Amino acid sequence: MVKTQRVVITPGEPAGIGPDLVVQLAQREWPVELVVCADATLLIDRAAMLGLPLTLRPYSPNSPAQPQTTGTLTLLPVALRESVTAGQLAIENGHYVVETLARACDGCLNGEFAALITGPVHKGVINDAGIPFTGHTEFFEERSQAKKVVMMLATEELRVALATTHLPLRDIADAITPALLHEVIAILHHDLRTKFGIAEPRILVCGLNPHAGEGGHMGTEEIDTIIPVLDELRAQGMKLNGPLPADTLFQPKYLDNADAVLAMYHDQGLPVLKYQGFGRGVNITLGLPFIRTSVDHGTALELAGRGKADVGSFITALNLAIKMIVNTQ
């Protein structure tokens, strides 16, 4: 890395394990400065509950970034709306969570931060606070005014991107259009090159129907939509293999020769990835004008403040973001 970069972190739901995980991140050195967008008292109290040392350094945007030393975090303060009891949701803190996301996103857009790593949020309590919220991905897409974003989950061995995300199953076939596939594959291909440093990405593409339609006998979306799009993009030089049946695609003979998989819908691709790498997975938002990675688990309210939360996914998300920063420099 040419110079030390700043990475901004949002711990997520304050009553969940996000603050625990951020405190655990501080128990080692990092080659980047970790700027945590959070309430100071929340982090200090949670560190005390866990019996871990923590010193908060003030965020100084006009000073050069410094590698993070053991036992420290850099604090970008955002005040809680209500005091926090570990494991107990407070509706007003839905506003606090969104404020941390907005400040972190804006800091990435204005060049303060080289990447954003997000902890788990509780969508229900944010909506109960009167804030329409479907997820991090959609929030950052709207706030950054990105034309289109793509959700990809990854472990060290497997990357799975989604053509559609949080849609009811009955709506998916209608959503798989030529325009959508062109857009999603273009973003996936571009970000594999620019953010992952893969010169000529090799992408496996799932069919939509069982057996990838069985030649039109089990649905015609492959013939009518997916194959024509793939043929057009192959003619432009993209290395695309598919459409392949999803029940056979996830085998070494295919995966060993691929850099990513494009699944048509959420539950087609993610169960395999989460089984293969549960606790080590990372959620990446492609198509944003900045790097964003996230843990692939929830708030685990029952574990908050107990010292039993696994920091593995957060570490993987941070390490991946650092690699992506290097690739984009």
Curated annotation (Swiss-Prot):
Main location: cytoplasm
Protein name: 4-hydroxythreonine-4-phosphate dehydrogenase
Catalyzed reactions: 4-(phosphooxy)-L-threonine + NAD(+) = 3-amino-2-oxopropyl phosphate + CO2 + NADH
Alphabetical list of InterPro entries matching this protein: PdxA, PdxA_fam
Cofactor: Zn(2+); Mg(2+); Co(2+)
Pathway assigned in UniProt: Cofactor biosynthesis; pyridoxine 5'-phosphate biosynthesis; pyridoxine 5'-phosphate from D-erythrose 4-phosphate: step 4/5
Keywords: Cobalt, Cytoplasm, Magnesium, Metal-binding, NAD, NADP, Oxidoreductase, Pyridoxine biosynthesis, Zinc
Listed GO CC annotations: cytoplasm
EC number: 1.1.1.262
Organism: Escherichia coli (strain 55989 / EAEC)
Function: Catalyzes the NAD(P)-dependent oxidation of 4-(phosphooxy)-L-threonine (HTP) into 2-amino-3-oxo-4-(phosphooxy)butyric acid which spontaneously decarboxylates to form 3-amino-2-oxopropyl phosphate (AHAP).
Annotated binding of substrate, by residue: H136, T137, K274, N283, R292
Pfam family, one: PdxA
Positions contributing to a divalent metal cation binding: H166, H211, H266
Record's subunit section: Homodimer.
Localization annotation: Cytoplasm
Keyword Ribonucleoprotein: no
Note: The active site is located at the dimer interface.
One GO molecular-function entry: zinc ion binding
Similarity remark: Belongs to the PdxA family.
Cofactor note: Binds 1 divalent metal cation per subunit. Can use ions such as Zn(2+), Mg(2+) or Co(2+).
GO terms, biological process: pyridoxal phosphate biosynthetic process; pyridoxine biosynthetic process
